[in-house]
């Protein structure tokens, strides 16, 4: 293979996969590589790499359309890099998840200019920088083809024209069909630079050439409007808004254009933006809003519409079919955008937030602003949808085909209502009530109706902060700054929710409706109906009923015992908690919750040894394996009835691993149920080839009596599937009961921090891990599972930048030289991680897990220091009860410590949600690649 002085000559154009295999298998060393065009996806590339005599091919996916951002399209490889040259250099420094690092390129050509992040200054660059219009014109006229080449700062001639040239050079370059939306090394596109100082005509010319008015700087989140506002270019601001640029985009630090204008002293721009009147949206909710739908119903409606669309227009691409629905899912209560892309349905939560200017809340007609992820704020859902019909940023594809809802049944006329034969009492004339919408009789007391009248539109049209509003039916919109929805409210059936214009079916609803109906004549005399329930003290009492914290935590009000509640009302507990509560008898404490354990008696005392029981005595009349399969089938299916023999056999195939397929290696830990070994699971592929998967094997001690608890926890783990959760592979029954899980090669996060603290940085590993832990806990919350033992020792590292939550009431990692926090016989209860309601009352909830999360983050930034030092558990409880909290670690920034303190609020309902914590760490401005390292949570 020939050598070349230019290390970038590894590009082989449209070389086929077969030809790449043949080239690389000619005796080259491991790590030899080439890059070629993808034959399956236009604009993508393929990295072909030789390793141990085999050629591996990795799809290199392009991000951002024509811009040069790329990543290895693999579940493990999610790092997005600017330029193919940067990507190759990244994997030349280290393997970073590939089987080997890139070593020697197979020499051919340089990659295309528009795929690189850097280059060298050429004649066109110099002429453009000096505003030499004639030289630029002659270069382009004579067929100069390097017009998209980049200089050492990654800037094309168009970038330089936006900085230094007049409109003549701009038009020359645009006539040559240069790329208008490429980013330079500073993350800026040409329109970013033009927005700083260029006149309106220059901006207009760029926009007419398809420059992206919402192009986002990957380094700081700036869009052109931010640049124009910061530099006081009012002409550019006006031109961008005329081109439908969002007026309220956010930087990575959450700053709006008017914030930047104020900081820079650009008063005229600030006042213009604050008084800007947003035009009405060019779409209406009757085109795409479906009211309350489950995820499954939305998917079915969307796919049915796409099928009908294809039947009418066979050549159409159905990607972009969408609808908006109201979700009652515990994971995301509020409005959800459901979108079809490449035959896959994706869901995006529409969040809400207040808007502040100079520390004061900006009024928005009584409702909050809406947004998706880190996208711009909008005053109504109509404006948000209209925006995403124009721009796709943040979505896989722009919104194209709205799916209309089914026609609503007509509201019955008042003429059809039976009239009383009684002579009505004398009363002053009253205006007939407005017909009730299908959702209005179940409306949240603080949320206005979905329908917006023309009069309301006129009243709210003075500025962009007072325009069309849309709030959710029944409940407030979900927001990362809000707490969770109230789950103590009774839920109606789908059939009840769908009846249009029906009268209230309960006494409480009749009471609420009575004032409106008193002036009408019905067969029932409503005028004598007692409506006190919705006025005066009655209203206050109703308010108390709904004063349950929205993050599903018990508070100081009288509640019925858990056994009298429906399963939906206690769904924020684990299913195992529900089972425990049903099995227990005894007195209930004042707030309606029975402690899961008398923890006060166990503060610093040893746990009594359990009685010895045989492992194979789970059931009196069935084999151990059948009983286990029956138990796990019931738990995983949620069916209380005894499964059939066929179902038991199916459960065996699904859950059980033959013990002879497991090979034990060394012991790596010891836990509550027994020992933990590394080992291998022997498997056969479809072709009959045998392979070995490295796993962790947890074994239940033969003398351990808690087999039912062991299997119950196993059934919970089998239902969990998330990138940030340790995966349970199966169960084996040999001489003892064994659980097979994925192996975390780096072990416990706590031990890793203790061993490698000098290598760990707060802005990299610690924030990545914190975001992944929060993401995993949010997933557990969405599955109604309370961890109850979240701590650094129970977080495992499968890679340096991948943390996973483990130990769901089962084993604990062995920490050499210390057994202080082990759940073994003679161990201690982990009081130092518990919230006050947990160690005082034995109450566990998602909010108590948030407290434990705060302590876990404190451990991380303290590099493994024990919480509260060497004091006893009793003294630690006294400190917490007196209002004291853990001090700020040296490595911890003030804004992260503030979040820790919010996790340690006395009242559970005042603590943040895991949704918020995930967003907080993933959107941290100091570490831009965090979102790519965290698994997206499904709504």
From Swiss-Prot:
ANK repeats: from-to residues: 153-185, 186-218, 220-252
Enzyme class: transferase
Disruption phenotype: Strong reduction in the number of macrophages recruited to wound sites. RNAi-mediated knockdown in glial cells abolishes a number of events which normally occur following axon injury including drpr localization at severed axons, glial recruitment to severed axons, up-regulation of drpr in glial cells and clearance of axonal debris from the central nervous system.
Modified residues (Phosphotyrosine): 927
Organ and tissue specificity: Gastrulation embryos show expression in ectodermal cells along the cephalic furrow and ventral midline. Proctodeum, stomodeum and their derived structures (foregut, atrium, pharynx, esophagus and hindgut) continue to show expression from stage 8-9 to late embryos. Other ectodermally derived structures (frontal sac, salivary gland and labium) and developing tracheal system also show expression.
Keywords: ANK repeat, ATP-binding, Cytoplasm, Kinase, Nucleotide-binding, Phosphoprotein, Repeat, SH2 domain, Transferase, Tyrosine-protein kinase
Record text on subunit structure and interactions: Interacts with drpr; this is required for the recruitment of drpr and glial cells to severed axons and for the phagocytosis of axonal debris by glial cells following axon injury.
PANTHER family recorded: TYROSINE-PROTEIN KINASE (PTHR24418)
Family statement drawn from the similarity comment of this UniProt entry: Belongs to the protein kinase superfamily. Tyr protein kinase family.
Protein name: Tyrosine-protein kinase Shark
Organism of origin: Drosophila melanogaster (Fruit fly)
């Amino acid at each position: 293979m020939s050598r070349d002085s230019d290390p970038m000559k590894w590009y082989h154009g449209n070389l086929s996969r077969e030809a790449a295999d043949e080239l690389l298998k000619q005796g080259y060393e491991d790590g030899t590589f080439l890059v070629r065009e993808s034959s399956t996806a236009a604009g993508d590339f393929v990295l072909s790499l030789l390793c141990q005599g085999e050629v591996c091919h990795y799809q290199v996916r392009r991000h951002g359309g024509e811009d040069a951002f790329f990543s290895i399209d693999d579940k493990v490889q999610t790092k997005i890099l600017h330029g193919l040259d940067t990507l190759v250099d990244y994997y030349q420094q280290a393997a970073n998840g590939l089987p080997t690092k890139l070593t020697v390129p197979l020499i051919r050509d340089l990659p295309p200019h528009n795929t690189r992040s850097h280059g060298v200054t050429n004649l066109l660059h110099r002429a453009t920088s000096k505003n030499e219009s004639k030289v630029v014109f002659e270069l382009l006229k004579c067929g100069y083809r390097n017009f998209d080449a980049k200089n050492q700062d990654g800037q094309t001639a168009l970038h330089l024209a936006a900085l230094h040239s007049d409109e003549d050079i701009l038009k020359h370059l645009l006539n040559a069909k240069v790329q208008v939306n490429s980013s330079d090394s500073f993350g800026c596109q040409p329109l970013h630079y033009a927005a700083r100082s260029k006149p309106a005509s220059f901006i207009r010319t760029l926009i007419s050439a398809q420059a992206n008015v919402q192009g986002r700087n990957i380094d700081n989140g700036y869009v052109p409007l931010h640049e124009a506002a910061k530099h006081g270019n009012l002409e550019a601001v006006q031109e961008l808004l005329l081109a439908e640029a969002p007026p309220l985009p956010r930087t990575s630090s959450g700053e709006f254009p008017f914030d930047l204008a104020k900081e820079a002293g650009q008063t005229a721009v600030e006042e213009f933006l604050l008084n800007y009147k947003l035009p009405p949206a060019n779409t209406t909710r009757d085109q795409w809003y479906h009211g309350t739908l489950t995820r499954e119903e939305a998917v079915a409606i969307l796919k049915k519409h796409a099928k009908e669309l294809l039947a009418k227009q066979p050549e159409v691409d159905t990607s972009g079919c969408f609808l908006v629905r109201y979700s009652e899912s515990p994971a995301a209560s509020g409005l959800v955008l459901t979108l079809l892309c490449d035959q896959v349905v994706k869901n995006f939560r529409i969040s809400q937030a207040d808007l502040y200017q100079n520390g004061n809340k900006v009024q928005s007609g009584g409702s909050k602003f809406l947004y998706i992820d880190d996208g711009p704020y909008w005053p109504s859902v109509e404006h948000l949808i209209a925006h995403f019909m124009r721009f796709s940023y943040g979505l896989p594809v722009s919104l194209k085909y709205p799916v209309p809802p089914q026609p609503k049944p007509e509201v019955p006329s008042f003429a059809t209502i039976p009239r009383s034969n009684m002579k009505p009492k004398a009363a002053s004339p009253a205006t007939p009530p407005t017909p009730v919408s299908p959702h209005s009789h179940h409306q949240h007391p603080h949320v206005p109706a979905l329908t917006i009248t023309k009069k309301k539109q006129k009243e709210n049209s003075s500025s962009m902060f007072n325009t069309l509003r849309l709030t959710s039916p029944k409940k407030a919109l979900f927001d990362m700054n809000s707490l969770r929805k109230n789950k103590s409210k009774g839920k109606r059936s789908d059939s009840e929710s769908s009846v249009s214009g029906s009268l209230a079916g309960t006494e409480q609803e009749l009471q609420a409706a009575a004032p409106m109906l008193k002036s009408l004549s019905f067969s029932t005399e409503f005028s004598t109906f007692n409506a006190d329930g919705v006025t005066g003290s009655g209203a206050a009492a109703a308010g108390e009923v709904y004063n349950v914290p929205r993050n599903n935590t018990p508070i100081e009000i009288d509640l019925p015992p858990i056994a009298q509640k429906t399963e939906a009302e206690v769904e924020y507990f684990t299913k195992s908690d529900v089972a425990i509560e049903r099995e227990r008898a005894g007195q209930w404490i004042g707030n309606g919750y029975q402690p899961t354990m008398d923890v006060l008696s166990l503060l610093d005392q040893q746990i009594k040894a359990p009685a010895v029981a045989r492992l194979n005595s789970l059931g009196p009349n069935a084999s151990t394996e059948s009983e286990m399969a029956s138990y796990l089938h019931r738990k995983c299916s949620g069916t209380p009835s005894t499964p059939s023999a066929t179902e038991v056999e199916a459960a065996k195939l699904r859950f059980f691993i033959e013990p002879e397929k497991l090979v034990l290696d060394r012991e790596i830990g010891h836990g509550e149920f027994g020992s933990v070994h590394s080992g291998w699971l022997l498997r056969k592929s479809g072709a009959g080839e045998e392979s070995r998967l490295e796993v962790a094997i947890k074994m239940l001690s033969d003398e351990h009596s808690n087999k039912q608890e062991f299997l119950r926890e196993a059934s919970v783990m089998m239902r969990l599937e998330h990138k940030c959760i340790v995966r349970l592979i199966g169960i084996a029954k040999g001489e003892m009961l064994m659980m097979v899980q994925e192996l975390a090669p780096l072990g416990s996060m706590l031990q890793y921090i203790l061993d490698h603290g000098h290598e760990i940085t707060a802005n990299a590993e610690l924030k990545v891990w914190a975001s992944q832990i929060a993401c995993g806990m949010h997933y557990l919350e969405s599955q109604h599972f309370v961890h109850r033992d979240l701590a650094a020792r129970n977080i495992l590292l499968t890679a340096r930048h991948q943390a996973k939550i483990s130990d769901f009431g089962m084993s604990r990692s062995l920490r050499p030289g210390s057994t202080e926090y082990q759940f073994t016989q003679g161990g201690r209860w982990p009081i130092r991680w518990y919230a006050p309601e947990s160690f005082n009352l034995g109450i566990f909830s998602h909010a108590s897990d948030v407290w434990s999360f705060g302590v876990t983050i404190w451990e991380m930034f303290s590099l493994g220091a024990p919480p509260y030092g060497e004091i006893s558990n009793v003294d630690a409880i006294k400190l917490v009860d007196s209002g004291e909290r853990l001090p700020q670690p040296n490595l911890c920034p003030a804004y992260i410590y503030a979040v820790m303190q919010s996790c340690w609020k006395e009242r559970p309902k005042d603590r943040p949600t895991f949704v918020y914590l995930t967003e907080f760490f993933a959107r941290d401005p100091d570490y831009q690649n965090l979102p790519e390292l965290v698994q997206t949570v499904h709504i």
